[in-house]
């Protein structure tokens, strides 16, 4: 009997690996060629006589009503020039990132065949960490000043924010921005809706960034992932006992969904926990749903939170 079970297990692994190989070959064969436009470099190296040409080629970066002197002053500003120097030092060779972008968009096109490869432009902006990457149907804009490394001298931010100012966070941030075009915004305050929304976003990263670690996908440290895994059952019991899954209390979003140094159970474990544990748990629910239901990704993204949760058969690991 044990021999039969062993043979079945081996066959299952073999079939799974063969299917994965076929899928990967199909993804690799998708033609994607990305040309990254280094607007940051063009802007800070332009001359007054060439500024008009730059404005013509990139009108969306030059709001009407501003005199050329505004842009020339920025180009010559010592602080902006120092920031540009640091970005150029880090990203003088952008080819590795370009290759990663091409790999990512092969995965995107495999799962979403109608998606067109956008025009990719890098910029240096105002360190708006809530908009590190902006994705539209035709444009992908990446703010390079927010990927210099968490210990960079320019970053005067709390650790829980600047820990994701690493180059390895660039592709996960692209997927986060891409997901905004695919996911309908949450229209209610129910905690479960928020959890499943971000769970879907993270599941997209499972599909589109298969070689990335869970820590990189969600923007945690490995230790924070370990904490969530070890306390999954405890957190889930807390959510059930406090009856907050279906609650519309707006405070829950700040306690368990939004960026924060830690999550707020109002218990001793708070200081040990990472922020956003609700998004991590929503991820596990969506993963469980996809494991137990044969649903295309486009359909998953349209489904409501209650249906996903009820059909997920989610049980935290002991």
Regions found by a protein language model. Give the residues of each.
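Extracytoplasmic/secreted envelope proteins and their assembly/folding machinery
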Residues: 36, 102-105, 201, 205, ...
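C-terminal motif of bacterial Sec signal peptides marking the signal peptidase cleavage site
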Residues: 13-16
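Acidic/His-rich structured neighborhood in mature extracellular/periplasmic domains
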Residues: 78-228, 298, 302-305
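N-terminal mature-domain "stem" immediately C-terminal to a signal peptide or N-terminal signal-anchor/transmembrane
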Residues: 18-84
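Acidic/His/Gly-enriched intrinsically disordered linker/tail segments
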Residues: 203-265
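Sec-dependent signal peptide hydrophobic core
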Residues: 5-9
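Positively charged n-region of N-terminal signal peptides that target proteins for export
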Residues: 1-4, 19
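C-terminal soluble interaction/assembly domains
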Residues: 247-318
């Amino acid at each position: 009997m044990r021999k039969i079970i062993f043979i079945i297990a081996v066959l299952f692994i073999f079939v799974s690996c063969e299917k994965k190989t076929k899928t990967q070959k199909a993804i690799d064969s998708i033609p994607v060629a990305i040309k990254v436009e280094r607007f940051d470099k063009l802007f800070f190296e332009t001359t007054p006589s060439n500024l008009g040409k730059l404005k013509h080629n990139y009108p969306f970066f030059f709001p009407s009503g501003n005199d050329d002197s505004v842009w020339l002053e920025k180009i010559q500003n010592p602080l902006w020039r120092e920031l540009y120097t640091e970005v150029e030092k880090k990203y003088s060779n952008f080819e590795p990132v370009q290759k990663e972008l091409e790999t990512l968009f092969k995965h995107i096109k495999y799962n979403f065949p109608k998606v067109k490869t956008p025009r990719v432009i890098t910029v240096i902006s105002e360190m708006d960490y809530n908009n590190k990457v902006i994705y539209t149907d035709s444009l992908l804009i990446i703010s390079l000043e927010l990927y210099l490394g968490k210990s960079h001298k320019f970053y005067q931010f709390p650790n829980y924010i600047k820990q994701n100012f690493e180059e390895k966070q660039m592709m996960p941030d692209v997927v986060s921005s891409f997901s905004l075009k695919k996911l309908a915004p949450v229209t209610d305050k129910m905690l479960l809706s928020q959890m499943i929304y971000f769970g879907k976003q993270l599941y997209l990263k499972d599909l589109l960034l298969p070689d990335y670690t869970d820590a990189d996908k969600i923007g945690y440290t490995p230790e924070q992932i370990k904490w969530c895994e070890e306390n999954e059952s405890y957190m889930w019991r807390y959510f059930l006992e406090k009856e907050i899954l279906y609650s519309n209390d707006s405070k829950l979003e700040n306690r368990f969904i939004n960026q924060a140094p830690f999550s707020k159970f109002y218990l001793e474990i708070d200081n040990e926990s990472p922020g956003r544990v609700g998004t991590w748990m929503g991820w596990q629910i969506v993963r469980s749903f996809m494991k137990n239901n044969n649903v295309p990704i486009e359909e998953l993204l349209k489904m409501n939170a209650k249906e996903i949760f009820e059909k997920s058969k989610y049980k935290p690991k002991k």
